[in-house]
């Protein structure tokens, strides 16, 4: 009984060493994202503007995401062609040279073994002996014959004879495998050379996005341009808002993606990128910027990712260019400087002013607050809110002046009546 009690006590107290040995399953707590660990609980740190915003997509278009703890690495080998194409140039060239060198050495060794087993090495000076390959007297000559066979050079000094069936079979195998290696490696190099990644470097985005009034509506705008004379065919643009989100159930979504409408329903997202264009997003009730004002914008932790896609006119391959804007790169109350001018018989684009902006009169209220003010004043939203507010202020000033004049006239009438009564 005492032993049973002692054993139960040990189980309840928990011997860590015994648990490590006997427990077959290790329970791992889920690891929260770093941003979730920083934000929970939220009331601990309210000053979120001092933290540096981590980019999801860098300005040069590269995604700032690293894949770690990938255990199923065999999946990269199942798609070996894409894996080789995605490698850096130095590794790609190294593999290119190594593959050819290894195949030449491998088949050169087999040719030497055939000659050695047949005894050709012992009858080099015997004119009556018919070797498998003439003038093959060592491993170096076998290696050279392997290169000549696979690359179909055929100098004619070393020739296979018809008295060697195993050599004929090896010749067929090396010819077929050599063609496969050539097709694979040359195709890999061709695809890597013809990739349109470099074409995306001549597609430029403005360094800043701006928010200002356009046609009486508050809009978010950025500019895109193409530096080449050969154009992008079927160009289209998309924009997404990357922002952390916490659901009503308490779930934290660190990189929640929300679509930003840049003309999908009207067809304005289809671009003719002959000259730089300003892409506009109307801030309405469906916009994620509906409730964001000028004062609130610097406090937001968000990122706008813009994606420009199209086909390269010269090759017909699909090209994609990316960029992003964080809150510090969104200017409220600014517009882009015009870059297109009419010269003698042609239009000229001045890319020196491509990134330049100038300040303009823009309400500091959010689009929601502007809509509420417009509805109270019974003004249609399509009108210029700022101008209508100015007109409303002018009307109030005119009414005050009229009231003042009427009051002055009344005071004058009263004074005249008093004078007449005295008389």
From Swiss-Prot:
It is a multi-pass membrane protein. This is G protein-activated inward rectifier potassium channel 2. Associates with KCNJ3/GIRK1 or KCNJ5/GRIK4 to form a G-protein-activated heteromultimer pore-forming unit. The resulting inward current is much larger. Interacts (via PDZ-binding motif) with SNX27 (via PDZ domain); the interaction is required when endocytosed to prevent degradation in lysosomes and promote recycling to the plasma membrane. The modification Phosphoserine is found at residues 16, 23. Belongs to the inward rectifier-type potassium channel (TC 1.A.2.1) family. KCNJ6 subfamily. Residues 139-150, 151-157 dip into the membrane without crossing it. Residues 390-423 are annotated as: Disordered. The gene is KCNJ6. GO terms for molecular function: G-protein activated inward rectifier potassium channel activity; inward rectifier potassium channel activity. Activated by phosphatidylinositol 4,5 biphosphate (PtdIns(4,5)P2). It catalyses: K(+)(in) = K(+)(out). The record marks 182 as: Role in the control of polyamine-mediated channel gating and in the blocking by intracellular magnesium.
